[in-house]
Amino acid sequence: MAEIINGKEIAESILNNIKKEVENFDVKPTLAVIIVGCDPASKVYVKNKIKKSEFLGFNSILKELPEDIQKEELLDVIKNLNNDKNVNGILLQLPLPKGLDEKDFLDEISPIKDVDGFTTYNSGKLFKGEKPYSIACTPKGIIKLLETKNINLEGKVAVVVGRSNIVGKPVAICYCKKMQPLFRRIPKQKTYLKF
């Protein structure tokens, strides 16, 4: 029997618990968000991230950069945030404008400050079954929803739709030891993955 999970209620509970924890910190955490260009969807995501971080009691820094920024300039912004001892987390909003390849920038973020878990270090730790500093938020949210509802995937067959580095792969990796292996054809690839 299918059950609809109210993610908003669970998220609100988690946020309130985090807010209480942050109130007991000696120093307020600081999140730096970098957005390049003026993609409307990215602007909405960034606005919501800043709003949530401030609700939690975090300081936030928003770096709004022009679409025509040069590679070296963006690398300098990341380097400065890495070196800023007051900044605890860095988030580079994706997608980047045409002409800027995210691969050139994500690994420049310190793994300790990598809020999204997108650096090779953090995603590599996850892939190896080790504990990364951070896991991408959507897979982490999915896992938290399942855990909150006491949904045990051990020994079950589960289909992970998608294979992106942001959602599909991390979800599959997080649960691959608990799920029965499943062969799935990847559209447009003529390949099969075993999860």
Q: What annotation goes with each model-predicted range?
A:
Residues I5, E9, S13, V44, ...:
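Conserved active-site and cofactor/substrate-binding residues in soluble primary-metabolism enzymes
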Residues K28-C38:
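Short beta-strand segments enriched in small/hydrophobic residues
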Residues S53-E67, L182-R184:
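Short beta-strand elements in bilobed, periplasmic/extracellular small-molecule ligand-binding domains
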Residues F55, N82, I109-I112:
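Non-catalytic terminal and connector segments of soluble metabolic enzymes
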Residues L91-L153, V157, V171:
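Anion-binding alpha/beta catalytic cores of soluble intermediary-metabolism enzymes, centered on
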Residues V36-I50, Y133-F195:
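Glycine-rich phosphate/diphosphate-binding loop of Rossmann-like nucleotide-binding domains
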Residues M1-V27:
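Positively charged, low-complexity intrinsically disordered leader regions
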Residues E73-D84:
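Short, well-structured alpha-helical segments in soluble
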